[in-house]
Amino acid sequence: MLLLLAEFLQQFYKGFAVFQYLSLRGILGVLTALTLSLCLGPWMIRTLQMRQIGQSVRNDGPQSHLSKSGTPTMGGALILSSIGISTLLWADLSNRYVWVVLLVTLLFGAIGWVDDYRKVIEKNSRGLPSRWKYFWQSVFGLCAAIFLYTTAPSATETTLIVPMLKDVRIPLGIGFIVLTYFVIVGSSNAVNLTDGLDGLAIMPTVMVGGALGIFCYLSGNVKFAEYLLIPYVPGAGELIVFSGALIGAGLGFLWFNTYPAQVFMGDVGALALGAALGTMAVIVRQEIVLFIMGGVFVMETLSVVIQVASFKLTGRRVFRMAPIHHHFELKGWPEPRVIVRFWIITVILVLIGLATLKLR
């Protein structure tokens, strides 16, 4: 939006041309979303408290969590509003990738909002029934996949890239739709499963989102893409603005979500942010890199799958409780230790993911 204004004002003062630079608009995206999140956070927390929109805590979980009962939830709306406003202000709104990522994020956030609303406002412990949650996730995920497939200008944008193997590129054809569906929906649910401790999900999301922003910036520049032997995706660089907005909104939210949390993001935030990561990775053909960098999300998801499968097949549980962060809590780890160690793991995995840019 402001880019259009800057282009108009260039005829009066050439200095406004500086807003053409993606790097500047990415930084402004961070600062705008961060400011919005920090300024609106206290108001949102007070509003949630007044409306008694608080988290309910399971009795069979770690006893330390009982003190969290009543903590305001649905704070993900703060993240999404900050991301949305910042992106609309600083991104090129004629870029189709910006709209795809933004709409997927908001639509998955809407699913989470309905789920949270039914749990917290209507006091329905089931929330949105799983079949309906997965149905709408599938609808939105498939719509995004089909759109990206049908509008792909070249086969490069529907090819699976294998990191560190520069000559291995697998044309997916219609299989691109299937892969995209699973990446977006899988990422959405993986982040949601991880969101069980104060700050546990948001910081890895910020780190992975920032790294994907770097991939988007490089993939959108033909010279960088050719030098690094990564797919050149025209227009993908504009997603650095969305990535910046995600970083700023996430850090602003973490200010209030750090242990002991003043607010939780709820499904409205977790489902949306996971879908955003998946969509960005698909656009720049870095699904495998997302799998690496989002290793904490993968670990959390696998722990649930293993726990459920083991109990159904043998009647025994592999972990004391799933997702796995609760397993470590029940082993006696203090909550901050679990959180920070998972952050450290994410830092390492993100660095490995970024290293694949040169290891080819």
UniProtKB/Swiss-Prot annotation:
<comment type="pathway">
    <text>Cell wall biogenesis; peptidoglycan biosynthesis.</text>
</comment>
<feature type="transmembrane region" description="Helical">
    <location>
        <begin position="288"/>
        <end position="308"/>
    </location>
</feature>
<feature type="transmembrane region" description="Helical">
    <location>
        <begin position="170"/>
        <end position="190"/>
    </location>
</feature>
<keyword id="KW-0997">Cell inner membrane</keyword>
<dbReference type="InterPro" id="IPR003524">
    <property type="entry name" value="PNAcMuramoyl-5peptid_Trfase"/>
</dbReference>
<keyword id="KW-0479">Metal-binding</keyword>
<protein>
    <recommendedName>
        <fullName>Phospho-N-acetylmuramoyl-pentapeptide-transferase</fullName>
        <ecNumber>2.7.8.13</ecNumber>
    </recommendedName>
</protein>
<feature type="transmembrane region" description="Helical">
    <location>
        <begin position="199"/>
        <end position="219"/>
    </location>
</feature>
<dbReference type="GO" id="GO:0051301">
    <property type="term" value="P:cell division"/>
</dbReference>
<feature type="transmembrane region" description="Helical">
    <location>
        <begin position="97"/>
        <end position="117"/>
    </location>
</feature>
<keyword id="KW-1133">Transmembrane helix</keyword>
<dbReference type="GO" id="GO:0046872">
    <property type="term" value="F:metal ion binding"/>
</dbReference>
<dbReference type="GO" id="GO:0071555">
    <property type="term" value="P:cell wall organization"/>
</dbReference>
<keyword id="KW-0472">Membrane</keyword>
<dbReference type="GO" id="GO:0008963">
    <property type="term" value="F:phospho-N-acetylmuramoyl-pentapeptide-transferase activity"/>
</dbReference>
<dbReference type="Pfam" id="PF10555">
    <property type="entry name" value="MraY_sig1"/>
</dbReference>
<keyword id="KW-0132">Cell division</keyword>
<feature type="transmembrane region" description="Helical">
    <location>
        <begin position="236"/>
        <end position="256"/>
    </location>
</feature>
<dbReference type="Pfam" id="PF00953">
    <property type="entry name" value="Glycos_transf_4"/>
</dbReference>
<comment type="function">
    <text>Catalyzes the initial step of the lipid cycle reactions in the biosynthesis of the cell wall peptidoglycan: transfers peptidoglycan precursor phospho-MurNAc-pentapeptide from UDP-MurNAc-pentapeptide onto the lipid carrier undecaprenyl phosphate, yielding undecaprenyl-pyrophosphoryl-MurNAc-pentapeptide, known as lipid I.</text>
</comment>
<keyword id="KW-0812">Transmembrane</keyword>
<feature type="transmembrane region" description="Helical">
    <location>
        <begin position="73"/>
        <end position="93"/>
    </location>
</feature>
<feature type="transmembrane region" description="Helical">
    <location>
        <begin position="135"/>
        <end position="155"/>
    </location>
</feature>
<keyword id="KW-0961">Cell wall biogenesis/degradation</keyword>
<dbReference type="GO" id="GO:0009252">
    <property type="term" value="P:peptidoglycan biosynthetic process"/>
</dbReference>
<dbReference type="InterPro" id="IPR018480">
    <property type="entry name" value="PNAcMuramoyl-5peptid_Trfase_CS"/>
</dbReference>
<dbReference type="GO" id="GO:0005886">
    <property type="term" value="C:plasma membrane"/>
</dbReference>
<keyword id="KW-0131">Cell cycle</keyword>
<keyword id="KW-0573">Peptidoglycan synthesis</keyword>
<keyword id="KW-0808">Transferase</keyword>
<dbReference type="InterPro" id="IPR000715">
    <property type="entry name" value="Glycosyl_transferase_4"/>
</dbReference>
<feature type="transmembrane region" description="Helical">
    <location>
        <begin position="25"/>
        <end position="45"/>
    </location>
</feature>
<dbReference type="GO" id="GO:0051992">
    <property type="term" value="F:UDP-N-acetylmuramoyl-L-alanyl-D-glutamyl-meso-2,6-diaminopimelyl-D-alanyl-D-alanine:undecaprenyl-phosphate transferase activity"/>
</dbReference>
<keyword id="KW-0460">Magnesium</keyword>
<dbReference type="GO" id="GO:0008360">
    <property type="term" value="P:regulation of cell shape"/>
</dbReference>
<keyword id="KW-1003">Cell membrane</keyword>
<comment type="similarity">
    <text>Belongs to the glycosyltransferase 4 family. MraY subfamily.</text>
</comment>
<feature type="transmembrane region" description="Helical">
    <location>
        <begin position="338"/>
        <end position="358"/>
    </location>
</feature>
<keyword id="KW-0133">Cell shape</keyword>
<feature type="transmembrane region" description="Helical">
    <location>
        <begin position="263"/>
        <end position="283"/>
    </location>
</feature>
